[in-house]
Amino acid sequence: RSVPGISVIDSSPEFSLNQLEIIPEENSIDFGKLLYGGSETEITYKLPVNLLSKHTLLSGINGTGKTNTVQAILNKLSEKVPFLVIEPAKTEYIDWAIEYNKRHPDNVISIFIPGCKSYKDKTNRQDIKIAPLKLNPFDIVWLEKEQESNVLTHIDRLKSTFAAAFPMYDILPVLMEDLIYTVYQNNTTDWLTKEPVFGRTLPPTLNSMSLAVNEVIANRQYEERVERNMKACLNTRIDSLKRGWKGEMLNTIYSTPWSELFEKPCVINLSYVGDDTDKSFFMALILQFLYEYCTAKAELGLIDFNDNGCKHLTVVEEAHRVMMKCDNLELPQYKSAMMFSNMLSEIRAYGEGMLLVDQVPTRLIPDAIKNTNIKITHRLVAEDDCKAIGEAMGINKEQRKIIPKLLVGQCIISTALSTDEHWIKVKKVK
């Protein structure tokens, strides 16, 4: 038993002390030191960078070291592999990126904070000017003339994104679909009845959508009271996206160049977005454009499908906002979650790795657990979370008991390269 000054703990289950087999010339990340019985060894755990293209799930309750673990990966990646971080809350990645940019002026990380024009550096208290982020939901990822515009597939994804972010009932989802198709057939933004011209046919905007509401509702020939209610519902949802800085970001013709977002190190922070529904919408929109950018590059032959390496990594913090587990098949949220589930399955072929971060793994869609080849867990305390992640990682019941007792910075990791699991102390990022 414990006495003052001396603590007694149960014997720790054993985890592997064997390193992963890595080709000497392969790029890898010095992840941290292996632990034996909770004590740090001199054995360094190295994680192959190319393995990240097979997706990663990182879980752990608040304050256990998840952000530090991600930053340890990004510090190494930034030398050769671009990345995108979508941060819905807090500003830890912004502060990290600012310090990184001071040390690496030749390879700076782009920082976007919608709703914020200047950010105070917490080290020297100076204001840093923040470039505006522009994202037109109706924009088409059309990189070169030889590529197909693929407007119909964009519309299908966009209507799912709208429906999931702004709950709509009865006939409203159908009206929203009609509205989206209508704005793509305007005289100046006609992508459907005429052949669009590369670089000349402009995408619709939220203003176009507002102007089309009356036309779409009138064509349905509802009685006056119903027509009035339908117009009010649609206009309320559209107008909410046109107000203030949201309008500056979304109600625009031209989006921020895709290469700025998806070809260079980039952090998008959504902490100034107060509404959770808006955060989910913005995150879904960014991921939708990311997927379309990957498919566009593939159409142009810019992706080597024989190369299984990681060409780009996307970190999705609070992943449940776009991949929430939903058991009701009729809800739009379920369809949206399935869209991103399919994206998770397909995007790996383009060399795109997804790093999903969440405090509660059981609230994510099943594919977030099943379809990630790297699983990292920090401390979890709920029994159902420990069981779900433990079974997915293939650890036994005795090993699972250590998950609620992990100290800050400690984690258990399993990968597709080994049948063993490793207990690691992740090195602290400066």
Question: Regions from the language model: what does each represent?
Answer:
Residues G37-I43, M249-N251, A296, V357:
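Short gly/ser/thr-rich secondary-structure transition/capping motifs
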Residues L52, N62, K90-T91, D275, ...:
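Short acidic loop-to-helix transition motifs that present clustered carboxylates
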Residues K46, I61-N68, E146-S149, C310, ...:
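Alpha-helix capping and helix-loop boundary segments enriched in small/acidic/polar residues
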Residues R1-I61, N68-I73, N308-C310, N328:
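Basic- and hydrophobic-enriched, low-structure N-terminal and domain-boundary segments
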Residues T56, C266, L355:
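Conserved beta-strand position immediately N-terminal to the Walker
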Residues L74-P82, I86-S345, A349-E352, L406-T419:
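P-loop NTPase motor domains
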